[in-house]
Amino acid sequence: MTDKAKDVRNVLFIMADQLRFDYLSCAGHPHLHTPNIDALAARGVRFDEAYVQSPVCGSSRMSFYTGRYCRSTGAVWNNIPLRVDELTLGDYLKELDMRTVLVGKTHMAPNTEAMERLGIEASSGIGVHVSQCGFEPYERDDGLHPTERPAYKNLAYNKYLEKQGYEGDNLWHEWANSAMGEDDEILSGWLLAHADKPARIADEDSETPYMTRRAMEFIAEADAKGERWCCHLSYIKPHWPYIVPAPYHNMYGKDELLPVVRHEVERQSPHPVYGAFMEQRASTAFAKDHVREHVLPAYMGLIKQLDDQIGELMKFLEEQGRLDDTMIVFTSDHGDYMGDHWMGEKDMFHQPSVKVPMIVFDPRASADATRGTVENRMIEAIDLVPTFIEACGGTVRTHVVEGRSLEPLLAGEKDVDWREAVFSEYDYGHQWMRQKLGRHSGETGMTMIFDGRYKFVHCEGYRPILHDLQEDPQEFFDRGDDPEYASVIQRMEGLLLEWALTRNNRVTKSDAAIDAYEDKKQQLGAGVAIGFWDEKELEEARREAGFIIE
């Protein structure tokens, strides 16, 4: 391991998409064995209480990349752009002479309106920087390329498949995400009925191995140039379409799934927002046992394939000599209900959706005491940005970054004044359920606060949702209108208000600059004399401030 006094040289920031916290063997899954991810956990720390700032791809990732809550970035759902002046991980690491690149997905939407107003060309260096969330797009691929979106024609992955001899119009769909029928017809992976079939593509040419190789190519290139780097390897899977190539498509069966977590009481007079979400198509599909039993084995196969590729990646890093100086993080942008709580997809705030896997390997000797341990203190996605900055030798701009560095926890410090709660946000304004509920956009926000026992969700225009995870760890019973919990609700509302009023919105002037400001001296030095009665009083003040030296 590296010397304690040294900084981390590189960062490998691995993110899966839609990976549940409990579908890893190191997290207790009895049938889905993930030895390579487990091995990474054995080298580092597995954070067992890690929460995302939003249980949906785009807004979660914007918080991961900025170190800021959704209400600070304004990105409260998919395809809501960041402000062009929003600082990201790439900005902070650039100051440390690190090359920060993307391989895979960000779900970042460029702020084209602001760029046009400011005269920023999209193809310029600054244009690419602000359009790609501060990353250098070594290969940007958000992983969803239906034929109805013509951008697939210029997709680098499709061009790769062409070179491998695959034929068709949209190779991403026709080969990587479709199966073959008995009459040689293409069976689309968009359709859940085909999840049990193998994708047409060879395993080595499918998306997860392809992205792994692309990350290796970048690392080898950067190492050859002697560059410090941060590589964000952002996998597309196990996000839908739920289809995986052989041999992973039939490795698991319905008897190897985790038991579904749901209760009939959840469908009896549910909270209006949760009730509406239960009626969305993905929820009604996965509420059916046969759908869940048919699709989840493919989801598990995608995870197994991912674990195998993590193994290939770790072997490569060892061969490159990078395991001694590279911080490695493995996480996910959110989870997946898969029928739990009568829901599909993610979006809401139960544990399968908002809680994620989080493993951090710190190569320095300062982290030796915590290797192979499980940390139960609550952390948030926004904690990674300050962790990376500090580990790489930088100073966190605390007036901008809202996360907390994990370095004290990685070093095994016990007396750390840590957070009392975690927060997550969601806006269903873009969803069908908004119309069903008769809500206008702008009044569809939801904010969760969880203190380790009570999970409180504020829902605009409705009563709150409250779960007591000590008495009800599976979150079946909503106590949001229970008089016995009135004092708890009042306390949680107070904590939420306090949090909402203390966001970092003054980002253009640092705390240090304000602390250094001496009001009287600054005003007198600028010739401003407010409130003085006569020349004598002014002269005394100027002498005290050091402007008159005798």
PLM regions with names:
Residues 1-459, 464, 473-494, 526-550:
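Formylglycine-dependent sulfatase
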Residues 470:
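Residues forming the ATP-binding cleft of Hanks-type serine/threonine protein kinase domains
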Residues 483-522:
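A contiguous, mid-protein "functional segment" used to position or interact
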